[in-house]
Amino acid sequence: MYHKRIKEAIEAIKQGEMIIIMDDEDRENEGDLVMAGIFSSPQKINFMAQEARGLICVSITQELAQKLDLPPMVQKNDSNHETAFTISIDAKEAKTGISAFERDMTIRLMCESNTKPSDFVRPGHIFPLIAKEGGVLVRTGHTEASVDICRLAGVAPISVICEIMKKDGTMAGRGDKFLLDFASQHHLKILYVSDIIQYRLNFENLLREITRESAVFMGVECEKITFIDHLEREHIVFGFPHKGSSSNEPKPLIRFHNVRSDLELLQNAQEWNALLKSIECLKEKGGYLVFLNTHSEYANSSKTCGDIKDFGIGAQILKRLGIEDFVLLSSCGGSKGEYNALSGFNLHLVEKIEV
């Protein structure tokens, strides 16, 4: 089914139409209205403002952000999902910048190849978002999904994106048919982040295994596996022997840990204690400790919980280990349902255990 959805979404984007992007087919969730930036028009921007009602943003690549001199909005991003907002902008020729015509002017200017940083004023009424390199295979966010679908459609990787709100100002929640009805009413195709993940995994691989060896870790004989990603960053996995009745544990314990400096880790007592508790649990029951070298340079180092969408490399590591069902050892609150688009990686989070 995902093949049909992604084919229809690609064709819609090519034709300048809008689509709705949601997280996962298996659950009702919030959705964003998305179109390719090169097909922006005042009428489409007005439709987003009137019908979708959310914040109109433009998802771009890191390369374009650098070209247009768009630095992060803040140096320490402590929003829930670490959405990579840059400083907001308006076209220099705009008067107020807020009208649909002037927001469209700003967006189209961003899409032109000869545009310079001096063509904009800051702050403004258009909010650029920087997609992570590697797209949804690194971060399963709508920012990355909207850039990825433009790439797949063969158009410039610049997308206009707007959250869809209900008329009463609330977001559509789980079990709410609002987004499906909205799509039907406006003849819009629905695409899931998990669809893009599955599609891209058929053709792409951001990881390669470079070593697999025996090693002693924290006094335990483990299997040490080292992977390297598309950005030449190394990620290390320690496999603790299973202590149960079967040598093939079907639902292994998994602990992800972002690599940071020793001093930074020691200064964060909560994270240090959670790591030690996880290691003791893995020693007792077996499983995998995955050290991810993906910590965001803009993240607030005081946070113990990173972006729950920012687990794409970890998910690909689990796939390479042959894991489908797993139990997560986590120091973060929240439900296991918060982990977006896991089905795209053919993964199932059976249980989440707080440590």
From Swiss-Prot:
Gene it is expressed from: ribB
Binding-site positions, D-ribulose 5-phosphate:
R27, E28, D32, R139, T140, G141, H142, T143, E163
Could you tell me which residues belong to the region DHBP synthase? 1-202
Give the region (GTP cyclohydrolase II-like) as residue ranges. Answer: 203-355
**UniProt KW keywords:** Lyase, Magnesium, Manganese, Metal-binding, Riboflavin biosynthesis
Q: Which GO terms describe its cellular component?
A: cytosol
UniProt protein name: 3,4-dihydroxy-2-butanone 4-phosphate synthase
Which pathway does it serve? Cofactor biosynthesis; riboflavin biosynthesis; 2-hydroxy-3-oxobutyl phosphate from D-ribulose 5-phosphate: step 1/1
This entry's comment on the bound cofactor is: Binds 2 divalent metal cations per subunit. Magnesium or manganese.
The entry's Mg(2+) 1-binding residues are E28
Q: What EC designation does it have?
A: 4.1.99.12
Q: Which Pfam families match?
A: DHBP_synthase, GTP_cyclohydro2
Q: Which InterPro entries match?
A: DHBP_synth_RibB-like_a/b_dom (IPR017945), DHBP_synthase_RibB (IPR000422), GTP_cyclohydro_II (IPR032677), RibA-like_sf (IPR036144)
